[in-house]
């Protein structure tokens, strides 16, 4: 069995070698000729799995993406050809949640904000959106959920928990967690369009850790060059891997599509595909996820006080401070190929669950943020 994998997919060789030959290739440069003898194709979001890529792959019997989103895969074409397809829903939801939490705490300190007195709207209340919502609620924030497909499918009593898009946009902070879709009643391409951008109040915080095309980046640039700019946190960009460079200086925080890049998140995505292939071949998995992860540098802390916003910031940034990624991105802006290079060589980053908190102040609020808590 020949298994073609994105070269940047962590742990692919050690997990899939038991099935056959593992062939790592650059994700953005995969060609149909690379798949002529492939039985399994494993990709990330940078590879378009379409008719061109699948032009000559008679042996292909399994396609997987180690990502939550699947907009880069022609699922209809795979179904027509009878090729099973698997993704990794929720694999990096905790990582993205940690990213948003870290960003919120940076902005709160920078602009002297009391997050517990603010509202946050989650656009897209799926796996990732719900994770972000839960962390925001743990901070004491009032959370609004906007997810039209879920609202339509919900029972009447559950549908009441959702708000429409216009209501969501009135929140103090709006965080986007949707796939990119271009057609249908819930299309998300330029969901935040020029009209919506122009209507936003000055200083409103907007966060995008979903897909770059969900926001109209040119319209954002025009707004940011006005006398009433917004506060933007951007992990994703139109035109990746070539972001609109002129927009970057007008953001609060800017990063190269790495919100979901924790060690756990990346390993979990590969692991979910490994489990799927085991099921497909009716094999029992020989390896477990935890065995793939190194021992964290910081494993245990005993807080000396109750969890106020300042302590939460210290604990979160002990594990992940988004400002490091922001500084690296800005320093390398304009360097050819740097967007993908930063993703390929991303520093080791753990999720909040890698830190165990002990003692009388290791309470429920910290556990809801994602820490492992063992109160006395």
From Swiss-Prot:
Q: Which HAMAP family match?
A: PdxB
EC number(s) recorded for this UniProt protein: 1.1.1.290
Q: Quick check: keyword Cytoplasm in the entry?
A: yes
- Matching SUPFAM superfamilies: Formate/glycerate dehydrogenase catalytic domain-like (SSF52283), NAD(P)-binding Rossmann-fold domains (SSF51735)
Q: What is this protein called?
A: Erythronate-4-phosphate dehydrogenase
* EC main group: oxidoreductase
The UniProt entry annotates the active site at: 211, 240, 257
Organism listed in the record: Aeromonas hydrophila subsp. hydrophila (strain ATCC 7966 / DSM 30187 / BCRC 13018 / CCUG 14551 / JCM 1027 / KCTC 2358 / NCIMB 9240 / NCTC 8049)
Residues bound to NAD(+):
147, 209-211, 235, 260
Carries keyword Oxidoreductase? yes
Q: What is known about what this protein does?
A: Catalyzes the oxidation of erythronate-4-phosphate to 3-hydroxy-2-oxo-4-phosphonooxybutanoate.
Q: Which reaction does it catalyse?
A: 4-phospho-D-erythronate + NAD(+) = (R)-3-hydroxy-2-oxo-4-phosphooxybutanoate + NADH + H(+)
Quaternary state and interactors: Homodimer.
């Amino acid at each position: 069995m020949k298994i073609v994998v994105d070269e940047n997919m962590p742990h692919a060789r050690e997990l899939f070698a038991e099935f056959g030959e593992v062939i790592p290739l650059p994700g953005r440069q995969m060609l149909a000729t690379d798949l002529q003898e492939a039985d399994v194709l494993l990709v990330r979001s940078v590879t378009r799995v379409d008719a061109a890529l699948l032009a000559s792959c008679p042996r292909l019997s399994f396609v997987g993406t180690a990502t939550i989103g699947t907009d880069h895969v022609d699922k209809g074409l795979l179904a027509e050809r009878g090729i099973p397809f698997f993704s990794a829903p929720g694999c990096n939801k905790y990582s993205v949640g940690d990213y948003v939490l870290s960003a919120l705490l940076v902005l709160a300190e920078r602009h002297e904000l009391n997050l517990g007195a603010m509202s946050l709207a989650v656009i897209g209340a799926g796996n990732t959106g719900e994770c972000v919502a839960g962390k925001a609620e743990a901070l004491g924030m009032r959370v609004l959920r906007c997810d039209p497909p879920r609202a339509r499918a919900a029972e009447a009593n559950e549908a009441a928990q959702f708000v429409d898009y216009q209501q969501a946009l009135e929140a103090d902070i709006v965080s986007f967690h949707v796939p990119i879709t271009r057609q249908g009643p819930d299309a998300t391409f330029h969901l935040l369009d020029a009209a919506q951008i122009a209507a936003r109040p000055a200083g409103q915080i907007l966060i995008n850790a979903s897909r770059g095309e969900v926001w109209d980046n040119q319209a954002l640039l025009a707004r940011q060059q006005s006398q009433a700019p917004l506060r933007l946190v951007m992990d994703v960009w139109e035109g990746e891997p070539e972001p609109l460079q002129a927009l970057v200086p007008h953001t609060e925080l800017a990063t190269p599509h790495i919100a979901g890049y924790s060690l756990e998140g990346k390993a979990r995505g590969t692991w979910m595909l490994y489990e799927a292939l085991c099921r497909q071949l009716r094999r029992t998995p020989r390896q477990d996820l935890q065995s793939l992860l190194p021992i964290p540098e910081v494993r245990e802390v005993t807080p000396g006080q109750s969890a106020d916003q300042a302590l939460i910031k210290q604990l979160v940034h002990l594990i992940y401070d988004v400002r490091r990624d922001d500084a690296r991105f800005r320093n390398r802006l304009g360097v050819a190929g740097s967007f993908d290079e930063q993703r390929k060589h991303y520093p080791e980053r753990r999720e909040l669950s890698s830190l165990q908190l002990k003692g009388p102040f290791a309470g429920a609020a910290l556990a809801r943020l994602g820490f492992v808590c063992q109160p006395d």
